[in-house]
């Protein structure tokens, strides 16, 4: 706005009005999907820091929306060790600029943009969408601010998805399984959904 004012030799008294006009114009372009806002961290202080399988993650946003399932992994670490930052933003996204479809099924739709992936979760009503930089270092999840068991669980699954992306880039992978601790060792039972893994491990506990 200041550059425009100087270009057209406007008096400084016009600066506030000009700044508002420029901001409104950019907001309209963003809403129409003609431009996309830069994807960067908004918050300054993380709500939670945790380490999972050696991967250091910082979560930003409302601590009430973060699942207690993450508590066993809470751990402080230096900023230099951060592998991924995930930010929960409790407002709708400013635009609907999705890009090219990479994956689409009943659970999610993944779009590719020049600088990011955009993920929609059709079955999770409290999640508007999520934007992740292509290297996975930063994720912004647009979600509803309401704190409920369902909303927290949905966010847990979304956060897990983006963690697994970073894990894969670090040579790690996840196995769909159930496990029991027996004689000081973890025994892993792997198989597709519905095979009876949880039922089998429950029998071990009995």
List where the protein language model places each region:
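Short amphipathic alpha-helical interface segments
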Residues: 1-12
